[in-house]
């Protein structure tokens, strides 16, 4: 493979986003080895709380998992990657609905330093700010996506207020990839999560790949056969995502947050009998996950969030499983021994595992021969610990990804129980996330009065 100088390699700004992993291979100079075990990318998977006794693995020996619960069984497919964490109360363990504490470390209440209020900021937004301050500027500092999120409280926060996720997949695609057709930044979002300048290429059913075909051909002609196959797979995934979006919108309209045809959006997902009226949340969130992975792969952002519903509800329409997660599966589930909740939690675990698999299929945007998985930390976080009883006495996380070698992982999966107690509050796991992303100054994050402000032991590899 021939190395090219930046002058010789004429790639426009927009094309450079799509081709980031392969342009990195061609630029002059060797890839710098990482000096510390840190991740470069963060992907947060946000859901409601769960039922703790149904979530916990059924076979545990020390930190080893020998048998998985029905809820977590799908995670066994990626067991070498995952670390399950529980036994961490929130700072305000009695908080329930509407508390911002899940990703911020601040519950309901007033937090101040020297009589100056410290407004809540979630771990994803704090990381995004720190990366920008460190000079790691990308078209989007973060990308927060999620369907069916307007009827309650979501988990990403900035300046004490919840960050509204982008609900429409086509708006999300325009936000992330609009720069390809414009050659510049990623567009401007309005407060409601829609684009002021939607991606014209998608609207015309024209692939963004066609707009940069000459640059694609330039790169294809310079990489070796192995890299060429990876390039084709990378571009095929973007084209497939475009096809799903144009099919789901019936022409690519980017307005609004609805998708009236969930079967077209995600074939085989919705019930054929009521496809015309089915709720699109699940189908849209699957598209959102595809968009996030591709945005990370193209180095359009370093921080992504997928939010499934809110603290008040998520409409589920899957084969043999329909209803509202909150009022139905959680609060009306005792009569069926929480069968529907267990089934939906297993479905969520499957999607989390699929994210890991998808990251492994993408080349690292920084080059070096690794995968996107190698440089990404994937965090499954929840708004509450015990959703049935509405409390935060025992928060739980799933951590996975190569994360630059930060995580202490095991062949059969690792289980960490912090043991409870105020000193082991869940904010410490959020500090692990910051540490994994190379952030060691926690000023301005979490509870300023927490005396044990350090990452939880046992998460990081030594």
What are the residue ranges of the model-derived segments?
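Ligand-binding pockets and gating/stacking loops
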Residues: 1-462
